[in-house]
């Protein structure tokens, strides 16, 4: 999405293969979590319809998730974050 407000690092653990990375736009919050180098959770919240971020819409929004994955991977590459090695385009 072109309307990224700011990319956020939510948590980064010491081994760099476990943790969270995400992006936030004016409307959406997107987060991925990896454990030992494997993505085990992807979260997408539409804050305009779900301001408390309760309902994860990632599974029913594969096109948006794919766009966010690409944007996040680009950002991680630009910042030399090794977490990019664990992202595969969904």
Tell me the role of every PLM-derived stretch.
Residues 1-43, 75-84:
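C-terminal cap/loop subdomain of S1 sulfatases and analogous C-terminal strand-loop tails that border
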Residues 46-47:
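NUDIX/MutT-family hydrolases
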Residues 50:
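Intrinsically disordered, low-complexity polar regions and short flexible loop motifs
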Residues 55-63:
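Active-site-proximal N-terminal segment of extracellular/periplasmic enzymes that hydrolyze or transfer
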Residues 84-90:
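Short, charged, surface-exposed hinge/linker loops at domain edges
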């Amino acid at each position: 999405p072109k309307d990224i407000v700011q990319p956020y690092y939510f948590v980064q653990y010491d081994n760099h293969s476990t943790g969270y990375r995400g992006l936030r736009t004016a409307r959406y919050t997107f987060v991925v979590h990896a454990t030992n180098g494997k993505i085990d959770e992807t979260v997408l919240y539409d804050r305009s319809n779900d301001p408390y971020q309760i309902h994860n819409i990632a599974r029913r929004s594969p096109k948006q998730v794919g766009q966010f994955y690409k944007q996040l991977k680009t950002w991680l590459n630009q910042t030399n974050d090794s977490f990019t090695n664990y992202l595969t385009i969904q």
